[in-house]
């Protein structure tokens, strides 16, 4: 019988499956997601595997609830790091985790406190799966919504303008379903508290709005610092806690 672990980080709910300590048939992964959905509410399923990159300690495969693969999930990375250290999958206080398109370096600073280092990010349209001809704005119910694109291992669109909070899930879905992004996008809505603090809500690709999004926090901080709206480090507040992003 397949053993699974439920974990939570800042309100994000995860199913964690250790495919290092037990055998998991890759062909069965879609069925595993369906069976887990019958029993649990979760945002992503995290599958820990032996690495294929010789420099990595472990590999992480991230499934959204719709069965699609996500390139990155920093809160998921943090959860997997805690699991890996607790279950002695790694022997040091640091971990190099292989993701879909990048590597994440995690350092254990305290018992359940982790620092995640991501080096690969880009503001280029091509890196964000946007056609070069696309405008960085779209219409929603007669209002023009502007956004800033950034890729942090996965594509994000960051909105800084004032938005009706009740409309955020609809506006995020509208951009995801538009022809601007070819493969969907995570949409972050920023409310600036002060120069080094923001409140953030994120409508995630393949999931919908979640209580937190680690890669969304990085995307928002990067765009804010780039445009002179924020200073680094930036405190990013979610409904159930915060992360600190140093750009």
Model-derived segments and their meaning:
Residues 122-146, 168:
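Active-site glycine-rich loop that binds ribose-phosphate moieties when present
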Residues 137-164:
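Internal active-site segments that recognize and position negatively charged phosphoryl groups
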Residues 121-122, 129, 155, 182:
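Proline-rich low-complexity regions
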Residues 116, 148, 213:
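Beta-strand scaffold of nucleotide-dependent catalytic cores
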